[in-house]
């Protein structure tokens, strides 16, 4: 995706291409998160019905619903990316902005991929 944005923006606007790549990745993660919320509601219905069956049988061990790990992973990724964005913008404002921005972009993208 980075190379597609680089081709659209050209060499002169390389930091913009880097920023668009990060923004695209964040939006993709948000889309995954939104779809996982739909799945989570389905999981809640399934586990709630299983809990009711266990209670009717009076079994001591109920099935307890816990949050899926991919939601937690998404929140950690989003939090770390938001922490890096101010640094990214600070590097853009300096004279050597393109070099630092591309370095920061590679660090952020390597974390996501």
Curated annotation (Swiss-Prot):
A cellular-component GO term for this protein: membrane
Name of the protein in its database record: Regulator of rDNA transcription protein 7
Compartmental location: Membrane
Protein keywords: Membrane, Transmembrane, Transmembrane helix
Recorded topology in the membrane: Multi-pass membrane protein
Natural source organism: Saccharomyces cerevisiae (strain ATCC 204508 / S288c)
Record flagged with keyword Metal-binding: no
Protein task: Identified in a screen for mutants with decreased levels of rDNA transcription.
Segments traversing the membrane: 13-35, 70-92
Domain of life: Eukaryota
